[in-house]
């Protein structure tokens, strides 16, 4: 489901700008339970080049990340739109680890001039690229091309002609499967799916689909080719959005009845050692926007995640399923969140049981359809994402971003402290929990007169920031200053401004009813010290329904 963008005003804090916690003080078992499992990546974005347009596809081979889409140039990290541009026509290549722009830069031009799909051969020597283009560099092409990854040259022995847009490419050792909008390949009828040899010759594989193909994933040892898209009929039979075909003949193996309602479309398919994962988007009531896991060998569903918000890409990695979407209602998914009118554009889930893990980097919707991220790929331990977005973690960043394993960011929404002294010898501190993009449990350090007096750990998330309190015991009639800071165990925010409180000498007494506006006889007034503005629940940039 597509949503429109909402903006929230930053909350002004007068008192505490605290953040995050010391690893030595963090309760490891509490953190593990709250986070739900291991995550390979921090939520803190690495410096990354940007595109002057939309990224539709990415692929990785030999430590290089290839990027395709609709753009005329790229620009360095931190550069504003239109500044420091380097020409790259719908295709660019980067070092996966350093992010450095590489010289591999064939221009993809012609009708619609858009790169929609790419994937490397199993040995990493060839990059197959599909889309809507007529020329690659000086070579005439027809919507698909093969590049040598060693030198970025066009393979002239690979010359299939495809009549319309190629939206999915799946290379295997013996065949390259193509999916998209087309009706003919190399002069012969092929309805939206085809297979060619590594030399580009059309293979006998043939299937009939009534609407475009958008995702392909081959499991050759199991004799299966997973196909996803907009279709409702395959080979003359009902098969809505997802089907498994015989990779040699194109005959239907499995049709997955009941998995997807009408007006839903499978956009992405990926596999790990024994499972396949599918993501979909839909339009209108009763659609399916989430992710499904199934057994590769049998096609049996393992779990079904009903988060709403148009899934564009799924990527299993080290026991975690990463996804790009604009999730806005995951209330029925373990570890999920309710619909608050905003979006979360990246998710991480345990592959075993779909539980959402505490990993919440984010983007805005950005350009075009305002979907946000469109594609994910991992290379050399770095997660890359591309799409329509123009912001990452509420900072300007267009088209591309990436995440490594180093946690560099302090928690969001620092707590605002208030003090209350209503009885002799007691000071009560109150604040609302902060939250962090990749750590559920944060530790709060409380300082009295500049000295650490207590630490308290608490789990929180952007949709759930509980109120916290702590009562200090001090001498009656004394005067003290308090401050707070919060840490995620790696990064700690600056300590808050100190607040001062006077502690009563005697308990408050009420012996007679006072006149209006006068204090009670014998009563000593309690003191409450607060910032100018009370704490607010987390507000994030997001989107509303469209």
Cite the ranges covered by each PLM segment.
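Extracytoplasmic surface signature
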Residues: 2-5, 9-16, 22, 26-506, ...
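Extracellular mucin-like PTS domains
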Residues: 511-512
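Arg/Lys-rich low-complexity patches in intrinsically disordered regions that function as generic
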Residues: 539-543
């Amino acid at each position: 489901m597509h949503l429109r963008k909402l903006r929230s005003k930053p909350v002004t804090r007068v008192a505490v700008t605290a953040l995050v916690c010391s690893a030595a003080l963090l309760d490891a078992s509490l953190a593990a339970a709250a986070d739900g499992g291991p995550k390979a990546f921090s939520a803190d974005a690495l410096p990354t080049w940007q595109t002057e347009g939309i990224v539709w596809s990415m692929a990785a081979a030999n430590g290089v990340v290839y990027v395709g889409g609709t753009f005329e140039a790229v620009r360095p990290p931190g550069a504003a739109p239109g500044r420091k541009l380097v020409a790259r026509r719908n295709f660019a290549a980067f070092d996966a680890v350093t992010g450095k722009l590489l010289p591999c830069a064939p221009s993809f031009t012609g009708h619609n001039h858009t790169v929609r799909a790419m994937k490397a051969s199993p040995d990493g020597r060839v990059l197959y690229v599909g889309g809507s283009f007529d020329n690659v560099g000086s070579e005439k092409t027809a919507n698909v091309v093969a590049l040598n990854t060693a030198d970025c040259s066009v393979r002239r022995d690979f010359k299939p002609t495809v009549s319309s847009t190629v939206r999915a490419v799946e290379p295997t050792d013996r065949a390259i499967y193509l999916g998209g909008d087309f009706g003919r390949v190399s002069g012969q009828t092929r309805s939206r799916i085809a297979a060619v040899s590594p030399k580009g010759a059309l293979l006998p594989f043939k299937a009939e689909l009534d609407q475009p193909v958008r995702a392909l994933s081959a499991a050759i040892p199991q004799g299966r080719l997973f196909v996803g898209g907009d279709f409702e009929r395959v080979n003359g039979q009902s098969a809505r959005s997802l089907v498994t075909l015989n990779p040699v003949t194109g005959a239907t193996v499995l049709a997955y009845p009941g998995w997807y309602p009408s007006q839903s479309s499978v956009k992405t398919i990926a596999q790990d050692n024994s499972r396949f994962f599918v993501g979909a988007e839909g339009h209108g009531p009763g659609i399916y926007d989430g992710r499904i896991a199934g057994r590769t060998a049998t096609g049996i569903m393992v779990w079904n995640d009903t988060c709403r918000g148009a899934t564009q890409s799924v990527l299993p990695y080290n026991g975690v399923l990463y996804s790009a979407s604009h999730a806005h209602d995951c209330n029925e998914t373990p570890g999920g969140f309710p619909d608050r009118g905003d979006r979360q554009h990246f998710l991480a889930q345990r592959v075993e049981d779909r539980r959402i893990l505490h990993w919440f980097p984010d983007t805005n919707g950005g350009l075009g359809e305002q979907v946000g991220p469109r594609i994910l790929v991992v290379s050399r331990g770095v997660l890359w994402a591309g799409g329509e977005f123009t912001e990452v973690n509420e900072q300007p960043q267009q088209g591309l971003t990436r995440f490594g394993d180093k946690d560099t960011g302090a928690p969001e929404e620092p707590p605002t402290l208030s003090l209350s002294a209503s009885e002799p010898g007691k000071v009560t501190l109150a604040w609302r929990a902060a939250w962090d993009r990749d750590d559920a449990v944060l530790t709060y350090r409380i300082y009295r007169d500049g000295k650490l007096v207590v630490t308290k750990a608490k789990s929180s998330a952007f949709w759930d920031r509980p109120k916290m309190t702590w009562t200090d015991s001090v001498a009656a009639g004394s005067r003290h200053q308090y401050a707070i800071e919060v840490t995620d165990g790696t990064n700690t925010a600056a300590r808050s401004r100190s607040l001062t409180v006077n502690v009563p000498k005697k308990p408050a007494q009420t012996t007679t009813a006072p006149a209006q506006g006068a204090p009670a006889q014998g009563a000593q007034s309690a003191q409450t010290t607060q910032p100018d503005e009370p704490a607010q629940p987390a507000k994030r940039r997001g989107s509303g329904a469209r």
